Structures are given as C-alpha cells and as structure tokens.
C-alpha cells in the first residue's frame, strides 16, 4: 500500500490539449490524451509540441498527464512506437496507458506504465500478474462488481482505476472483433466501426422473431454517481470518465459533476484527499442529464439488472420538459415544467423513433405555456395526439454558459511578510508545502497612519488574481507599520509568485516504471488463444518470458478464418427478454439456453450462451475481402494504391 492510498484521482478524457486544459480547470486530477500515434482513437491524436506545452500547465496544479498508447502493434510499428515513447518521456508526461505487452520488451525510458482496460482485467490472477510485471495502475473491466473489485484491490499493490461514466462497450474491452471481422477496422487499433449501435432483429432457434429491428447490442451509458462511496470502499482510487471523442462542454460538465461529488465525500469522511492541488469553483450547475447520454445504468457494480440496454435508440433524448398541446402548420403549442429559450433542441418519441427539431423562436403564451416555431417543421409531428411528452436534448442557455469561462481553479498559498526598514522579506508557502523567500532592499519609513498602512500591505500582498493562487493566510511580522509604495509592493509580490511557480514545478515528482517483482511472476495460463491479442514478436517474447508456451496470433493477423466469438459480453439477450434458464420457474431441465440469431441486413450472427460465467458469445466470421487486405499496421497497409503502381518496373521501348 502506497503513501497516497487515501488520495482519490478524478481522471478526465481529452480529445485535444484545449479540452485537457479545461478538464484540469474544472477539477480533473489527471487527464488522458492521445499522442501523435497508436492512441486507440482514430482522429484523436495530438502533436508532441501540444503535449509538451500541456504538461507544465497540468503540473502547476499537481495534475498528471497520461498518454494513451493502447493499440496492439504490428511488428513494423515497434520501432516507431519505441521512438515515440522516448519523445513522450522527454515532454515530461506522467505515464503511458498501454494494451500491447510488447511495449514492455522495447528499449524505452523508465516511464510509468498503466494497463489499459483493453487488457481485459477481470480476475485477481491477471491483475496480480500485471501489477508484478511493472504496471503501477490498472484499469479494471467495466463489468466487475464491488466484490470482484475489492478482491483485486486486496491482492495487488497497483492503483485501481475504474470507469465511472460515459459510453459502455457491450463486449469486454479488448475482446471485441466484430468491427475487424465486418469492416477490417480493428477496435484493438482504435478504429471501431461501432456495430453495437446498429439495429438488429433477434430470432430464436426455431427462427421465430423475438424482437424486430432494435438496437439490441447498444448499452445505456455508465453512471456511477450513486456508487462512488462504495467504489472507494472497494479500493478504487482513480475514477475514470470515458470520452476521448467527446466535445468540450461534455468534458467540462461531467468533470465538474464528479469533482463536486468527490469533494463532498472527501469533506465528509476526513480520511481521504484529492490527488492534486487547488480548489475548483464552477460558474454553472453541472448536470449529467444535459450533455449527451443514452440513458444511465450502473451496469454490474451492484448486481445484474434488466435495464442496461438502450434498445430503442442510441440517440440522446435529454430530459422531459413538458408536453405538446397542439401542432399547427409552422408552430406547436406546448405546456412546460421548465422555461424554454430560442435555440433549444427539442424532441418527441414517435413509435420509438426520435423526432427532433431546433426551436428557432419561442414565445411565452401563458402560465407555463409556450408557442414554439421550429427551424424546420418535422412532417411526423402532425401524427401526435395532444399531451404527447416533450423532451429537451439541448438546453441553449445552459450550453451558452459552458462556452464562456465556466470554472476557476486556484492553489492555496500562505503569505508572510517580515524584515525591517532596510529590507523586506516575503515568504510564500503553497498548500503542498513548497516555500520560497524573496527580499526587497530599500529604506522604508514608518507610516503616518499605521492601521491604513498595515491594511494596504495585507491587501496588496493578497492580490493574486492574475496568478493561479489565492491567499489562504496573510501574516505581517514587521517591527512597525512601514510605508511601501504600491508599485514596489506589486512588483515584489509578482516576482515572488513567479518564483513559487518555478519552485513548485521543480519540486514536482513524476512516477517511474515499477520494477518486476522478485521472483518474477508466472502468467496464469500456458496457452493463449487469439483473445490475448498477441500481434508482434515482442509481445510473444514477453509471454514466453513469463511461462506461456503456446501463443495463437491476434485476430488481426488473419489466422482465424472460421466462426469464432467476435464479441464476448456480460450483456445477455436471453436475460433481457426473460428467456434465461436461471430465471425459469418449474423444471429447469426443460429450459436450455439454445443458440439464437441476430440479423442486420445480410449480416447474420449466432448467439451462444455460456451460462456458468453468465456470458453471451456473438459468433461470426471474418469477411473474405478483409483476408485479402494487408495486415493492419503493416508498412504495406499504409502505402496507397497509386504509390504501389509507381513501384512497378518501367516498360522498355
């Protein structure tokens, strides 16, 4: 158990450096962001220069920057990845989040390593192995319950990180191959085609339709607001928000929401602290209901629930705001529970489909009543009857508040002024205990009005508005009240604040790679199937080093050509439609979890049910045209057809 075992880390996502800065200002203790490559999010990469500028910004608040390098790597990518890791280390980032074990075999600087959720950490054995092999922090599978989390926490000394909010992958992370099988875009390489958000028809083993054209693999969004205390007790110390594709207002809002929640718990309990410095003040009221979500679930943290899926629509409908009274040619009359504004996004559900429109103009027509003129009148609106429920998925005024400065974060500093007529001595001590002393020589006379002079000194020293500090305490220990001209005092204070900045950055300590345990750990299995995602020689060497004998290639290597589980998930469609043998009354033997089918257009997937661990396997086969494509990540794959043509030998004559 480390010294910091009482410190809680709120970890926010950032698509880019601008969002990362705002996440920190809104209260994140750490931010995870993609570097220039291998970041498992197609289109969310950032230059080394941007990351190098972000690092000191974060470190001034004691906040950390984690870079995601969590794709599986082709052999041709190992050298570029090794160079990139060296460059990232030089920018000063705090840690790398990785999936590919080959990275541990590369010749890289001693950067702290975190195991990505893509490593599929569900068991004590695997968690302990990863902790023993050099991972400081491990991101557990989102499907775990409190008991499983607690067991892993008790068995390892790694910091436990857990997803508390955002989109849920329906499959175990790292155990989903459907995107690659159908499109050649590998989820393990950050290019998921999101087959789970498509509509499917479910059929039983007799071919009978159980459910028609629903989003049967689409999960609601994760929201652990109600479970934070229980997760802390189970050993979670890093609370992760999903969303490296999400926009600025989402990250501001959700970060602020959890900052306030965690601060309240820290305040109440007394034995916990936040993992970085400063206090955060928000200039808006955070609401998880007002930015994009697909409904909320706490997934399996407490127990299996029947309502984890968002089958009707993966779209965002927002909050109920009232009902539609009447629809006219170019406007509608509505009764509301909340005031409306021009620019609001409103919607109704018609036969489970979301029919949405922007309010071009709204006019109050009475007590809680408005007339709304949409930008474009949806044709389907005329189908609805009076008193049809109305939702708002874009609250214009609330969103506007988020586009402005919506938060401030300041670090506490204690100020002490001492000295005598010939020299003033100013000491600034930050809340972390970093202290600097600055002196000002001169001939300072006794002031005529002692009380006024003392107040002037106090106020002048506490003026920290332009810095990231606030004065927690100001002490003046002078033999008498001295007169110091304001211009001199201001410059003196500004120089001292700059010195404190430099001293705090210099005293910042980043982590480093954890040494491998002695004796070296042994991997819990001796044979790895394609589910282990071993895609390069270095990853093979890693597993051989720790006792694995037989290693099958990753799915992306195109050696699994037949029917295999392209998704393994805790989400069970038998359970969702009350067809689970475990729930059946009467003679259990007569109930078998026979296979079912999911159909989307020409695409037919078989569902098999593994009832002991309570899992569903989605069985599919890689498409033939994908087998003909170059392997993802290989040099060949990055060459365009035009460039290939140029390599043909020139015709003579």
Where are the regions that the model predicts?
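Aromatic- and glycine-enriched glycan-recognition loops and surfaces
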Residues: 43-52
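Surface-exposed amphipathic alpha-helical tracts and adjacent flexible/coil segments at the periphery
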Residues: 2-26, 30-33, 37-40, 54-55, ...
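Residues at the C-termini of beta-strands that transition into short coil/loop
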Residues: 117
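Short active-site loop/helix that positions an aromatic residue
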Residues: 102-109
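Short, conserved active-site loop motifs that form the nucleotide-linked donor/cofactor pocket
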Residues: 94
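Short, glycine/polar-rich helix-capping loops at beta-to-alpha or helix-loop-helix junctions
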Residues: 122-126
């Amino acid at each position: 158990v480390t010294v910091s075992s009482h410190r809680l880390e709120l970890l926010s996502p950032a698509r880019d450096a601008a969002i990362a800065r705002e996440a920190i200002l809104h209260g994140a203790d750490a931010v995870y962001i993609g570097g220039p490559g291998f970041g498992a999010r197609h289109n969310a990469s950032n230059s080394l220069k941007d990351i190098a500028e972000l690092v000191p910004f974060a470190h001034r608040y004691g906040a950390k920057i984690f870079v995601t390098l969590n794709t599986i790597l082709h052999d041709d990518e190992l050298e570029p990845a090794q160079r990139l890791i060296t460059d990232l280390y030089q920018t000063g980032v705090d840690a790398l989040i990785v999936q590919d074990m080959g990275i541990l075999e590369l010749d890289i600087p001693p950067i702290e390593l975190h195991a990505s959720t893509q490593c599929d950490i569900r068991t004590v054995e695997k968690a302990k192995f990863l902790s023993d092999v050099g991972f400081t922090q491990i991101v557990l599978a989102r499907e775990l319950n409190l008991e499983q989390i607690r067991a892993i926490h008790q068995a390892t000394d790694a910091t436990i990180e857990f997803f508390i909010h955002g989109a849920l992958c329906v499959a175990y992370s790292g155990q989903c191959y459907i995107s690659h099988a159908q499109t050649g875009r590998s989820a393990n390489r950050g290019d998921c085609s999101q087959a789970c958000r498509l509509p499917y028809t479910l059929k039983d083993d007799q071919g009978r339709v159980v459910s028609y054209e629903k989003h049967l693999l689409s999960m609601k969004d994760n929201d652990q607001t109600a479970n934070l205390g229980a997760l802390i007790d189970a050993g979670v110390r890093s609370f992760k928000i999903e969303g490296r594709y999400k926009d600025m207002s989402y990250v501001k809002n959700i970060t602020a929401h959890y900052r306030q929640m965690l601060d309240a718990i820290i305040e109440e309990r007394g034995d916990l602290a936040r993992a970085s410095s400063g206090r955060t003040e928000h200039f808006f009221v955070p609401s998880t209901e007002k930015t994009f979500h697909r409904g909320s679930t706490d997934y399996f943290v407490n127990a299996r629930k029947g309502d984890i899926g968002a089958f009707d629509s993966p779209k965002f409908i927002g909050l109920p705001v009232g009902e539609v009274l009447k629809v006219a040619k170019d406007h509608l009359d509505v009764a509301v529970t909340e005031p409306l504004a021009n620019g609001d996004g409103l919607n109704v559900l018609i036969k489970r489909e979301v029919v949405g429109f922007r309010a071009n103009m709204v006019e109050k027509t009475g007590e809680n009543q408005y007339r709304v003129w949409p930008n474009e009148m949806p044709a389907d609106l005329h189908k609805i009857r009076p008193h049809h429920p109305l939702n708002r998925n874009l609250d214009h005024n609330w969103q506007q508040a988020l586009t402005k400065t919506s938060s401030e974060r300041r670090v506490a500093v204690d100020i002490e002024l001492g000295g005598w007529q010939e020299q003033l001595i100013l000491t600034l001590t930050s809340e972390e205990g970093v202290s600097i002393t600055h002196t000002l020589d001169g001939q300072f006379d006794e002031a005529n009005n002692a009380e006024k002079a003392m107040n002037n000194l106090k106020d002048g020293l506490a003026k920290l508005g332009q810095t990231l500090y606030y004065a927690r305490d100001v002490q003046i220990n002078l033999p008498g009240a001295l007169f110091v001209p304001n211009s001199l005092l201001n410059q003196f204070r500004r120089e001292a604040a700059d010195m404190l900045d430099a001293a705090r950055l210099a005293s910042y300590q980043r982590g480093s790679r954890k040494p491998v345990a002695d004796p070296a750990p042994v991997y819990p299995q001796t044979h790895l199937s394609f589910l282990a995602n071993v895609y390069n020689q270095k990853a093979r060497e890693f597993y051989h080093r720790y006792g694995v004998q037989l290693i099958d290639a990753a799915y992306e290597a195109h050696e699994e050509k037949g029917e295999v589980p392209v998704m393994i998930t805790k989400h069970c469609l038998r359970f969702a439609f009350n067809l689970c043998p475990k729930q059946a009354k009467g003679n259990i033997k007569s109930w078998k979890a026979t296979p079912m089918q999911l159909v989307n257009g020409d695409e037919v997937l078989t569902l098999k049910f593994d009832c002991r661990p309570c899992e569903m396997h989605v069985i599919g086969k890689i498409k033939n045209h994908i087998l003909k494509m170059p392997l993802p990540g290989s040099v060949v794959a990055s060459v365009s057809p035009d460039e290939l043509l140029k390599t043909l030998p020139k015709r003579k004559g």
